[in-house]
C-alpha cells in the first residue's frame, strides 16, 4: 500500500495538472494533500485524482472561503471520517479518517500552523494528546508539521525546544518517525526558505506501534521538473506499507 503526502502550495494553481500527473506516476493508493483549497484548480485536481483511481475523497477545504488552505484525502478504498474531542480544533488543518483497505488503518493528516498568532503550540499539544490515546488499530499520521529536531532537521538554527520536544514526546509515546526509522541521522530537507535558501525537514510521517511492522520503504521526492522547477515548494513523502 503506497501513501503519498504532499504540500502542494496555495491550492496548486496553474501547477495543478502537473501535480496530478506526478501523483499518477507515483501510483499511490492513498494521497493526502496540504494547502488544498476550495478553488477551481484544486477542484480539478480532485477530479483528476478520481480519474486516477482515487475516487473516495474527503476534504476540509471550505468553498465559502476558497483562499483558505485545507486538506484533501483521496483513496482507492472507502473512507470513514473520525472525529475525536481531543483532536486539534482547527477544522481546515486536521483530517482523520479510517481507510477501509484490505488491511485497514486510520490516517491522520495535519498542516500545523506557524508560530504567528499563537496557534501552533495548542495544535501540537492536541496532536500529542490524540497520539497518546489508546489506539486499537494501526494509525499513520502525516503532514507538514512546521517542526523538526534541533541540529538534525535544519541547515541553520530554526527549531526551538518546544518543537524539538514535541518530536521527542511522540517518539516516547510509541510513534515512529518513518524517515528516521529507516535512515537514522541522514540529512534530508523538504522545504527551503525563499530568502536564505536554507533547508528544513518539516514534512513527516509517524506510525504507531501497531503499524510500524508494516513499514517497508520511505522516501522524499521532489517529482519531475519538466520546466526546471518542481511542482511545489515542498518535497512529497512516499511511504510503502505491507498490504
Stretches found by the model and what they are:
Residues 66-81, 99, 195-214, 241-242:
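Conserved beta strand-loop-helix elements of the APE1-like EEP
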Residues 192-195, 225-231:
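Short proline/glycine-enriched turn/loop segments at secondary-structure junctions
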